[in-house]
A protein has these predicted regions:
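Short internal beta-strands
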Residues: 37-44, 87-91
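Anion (oxyanion) recognition and catalysis
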Residues: 32, 81, 120-121
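Short, basic, glycine/proline-bearing loop/turn elements
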Residues: 9-14, 58-65, 99-102
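Short amphipathic alpha-helical segments and helix-helix/interface helices
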Residues: 25-29, 74-78, 116-117
Length: 129
């Protein structure tokens, strides 16, 4: 049986315009397809990934235009619905960003910082991204 891995995603929006997704969320989806077992905790600026309906404008450099902007909320929904990967958001990181629970995609669970040690115990590996 594969080891269960807890993935805490904190560094947000790196390479998302170039890649059209978050590299870690993409990697977790691919690994889940190969049989790995993951749980995701979004913290810091990465809590914004779970905001429903968010988007990013396209990027133009000279005459080149990036027309496939990332849709991070769709990536989170893919993890939840298609990949069956549990996704948590640290509730203490919502308020400083002006976010509320009702702004998040359905299925994302709130977690307090105080609950982190208990979720650590449920996983063989903990990675901070």
């Amino acid at each position: 049986m594969p080891k269960r891995t807890l993935n805490i995603v904190e560094s947000a929006y790196r390479a998302v315009i170039e890649e059209q997704d978050d590299t870690i969320l993409w990697l977790l989806a691919a690994m889940q397809g190969a049989g790995a077992q993951h749980t995701v905790v979004l913290r810091g600026n990465a809590v914004c990934y779970a905001v429903a309906g968010q988007g990013a404008p396209s990027l133009t450099v000279g005459e080149w235009k990036q027309t496939h902007a990332p849709k991070m909320d769709k990536d989170v929904l893919d993890l939840l619905e298609k990949r069956k990967i549990p996704v948590f958001v640290l509730e203490e990181d919502l308020v400083p960003r002006g976010l509320t629970r009702d702004m998040l995609v359905p299925g994302v669970e709130l977690m307090s910082r105080a609950a982190l040690p208990s979720i650590f115990e449920q996983h063989a590996v903990v990675s901070l991204w």
